[in-house]
Curated annotation (Swiss-Prot):
Protein known as: Undecaprenyl-diphosphatase
EC number assigned by the record: 3.6.1.27
Entry function: Catalyzes the dephosphorylation of undecaprenyl diphosphate (UPP). Confers resistance to bacitracin.
Species, as recorded: Anoxybacillus flavithermus (strain DSM 21510 / WK1)
Top-level class of the enzyme under EC nomenclature: hydrolase
GO biological process: cell wall organization; peptidoglycan biosynthetic process; regulation of cell shape; response to antibiotic
Family classification: Belongs to the UppP family.
Compartments in which it is found: Cell membrane
InterPro entries for the chain: UppP
Keywords noted in UniProt: Antibiotic resistance, Cell membrane, Cell shape, Cell wall biogenesis/degradation, Hydrolase, Membrane, Peptidoglycan synthesis, Transmembrane, Transmembrane helix
Membrane-spanning ranges: 3-23, 48-68, 89-109, 116-136, 151-171, 192-212, 225-245, 253-273
Extra remark: Bacitracin is thought to be involved in the inhibition of peptidoglycan synthesis by sequestering undecaprenyl diphosphate, thereby reducing the pool of lipid carrier available.
Catalytic reaction annotation: di-trans,octa-cis-undecaprenyl diphosphate + H2O = di-trans,octa-cis-undecaprenyl phosphate + phosphate + H(+)
Length: 273
């Protein structure tokens, strides 16, 4: 085992954790950091590297669970004390929000994996996602849902429809859902909270299915890389989520949209210029 490869695993976990929940496309960053620089497939193998990315994504999911643990306890009626009165987020809101993309994802998973995962499609997704985010800040409705507990079923469903755009690689799940939320009258913070809470079951489920299919690639020799990457992703996702939630109502989405366009330009220059 080489220390340099452990450092690469740590860096990949950092990139995953820092970008998974920000509206900047973790896929786009992995193209630059892994495919163009660290090349995890060289020390983990092609399928081992893909499994590694699933494992570090679970580190990010765990971070979201920690940040929103009180809300998850409330959703599952496990929170001690008096139950919140009045409007509140429920499991039905989550289900309604997940339904559209969940159905399309199951129906077209193989097609997406085979035909849509390429550098060119990610580049297109980065730019189109940026335009959606700019449009959300410019044309979003007057805020009627200040907090995640004010969200209606209609808003949740529309956000779910917009989330279907994230099936296109590079579009970004959080970028599409936060934009969709703002467009239908959620505050930026409410849209972000709903996005992150909704991401946990769908990411955990997808990762679990992938691991069941590919668990054999987590070998004894490769295990240290998986552990380091998982812990790194967890720590940096924890920091990134908390930082983003403090930031989003102040800076809104346009700065992230500009960053995405710059990232797309870098990928274009490196791959196509």
């Amino acid at each position: 085992m080489h220390i340099i490869e452990l450092i690469k695993a740590l860096i990949l976990g950092l990139v995953e954790g820092a970008t998974e929940f920000a509206p900047v496309s973790s896929t786009g960053h992995m193209i630059i950091v892994d495919d163009m620089w660290l090349k995890s497939s060289e020390f983990l193998g092609k399928y081992g590297a893909n499994t590694f990315k699933v494992v570090i994504q679970l580190g990010s999911v765990l971070a979201a669970v920690v940040v929103f643990k009180d809300k998850f306890f409330e959703l599952l009626y496990l929170r001690k004390g008096e139950v919140r009165k009045g409007p509140r987020l429920t499991l039905m809101h989550i289900f309604v929000g997940l339904l559209p993309a969940g159905v399309l994802g199951v129906l077209f998973e193989d097609y997406i994996d085979e035909h849509l995962f390429s550098t060119k499609t990610v580049l297109i997704g980065l730019v189109l996602g940026a335009l959606l985010m700019i449009a959300a800040d410019r044309f979003g409705k007057r805020t009627v849902a200040q907090t995640v507990d004010d969200i209606t079923y209609k808003q949740a469903f529309i956000v779910g429809l917009v989330q279907c755009l994230s099936l296109w690689p590079g579009f970004s799940r959080s970028g599409s859902t936060i934009s969709g939320g703002v467009l239908v009258g959620m505050s930026h913070r409410a849209a972000a909270d709903f996005t992150f809470i909704m991401a946990v079951p769908i990411m955990a489920g997808a990762s679990a299915i992938s691991l069941l299919k590919n668990w054999q690639y987590i070998t004894f020799d490769a295990l240290p890389f998986f552990v380091v990457g998982f812990i790194s992703a967890f720590v940096f996702a924890l920091l990134a989520i908390r930082f983003f939630l403090r930031l989003i109502n102040r800076v809104r989405l346009v700065p992230f949209a500009i960053y995405r366009i710059v990232l797309a330009a870098v990928i274009y220059v490196v791959y196509f210029a």
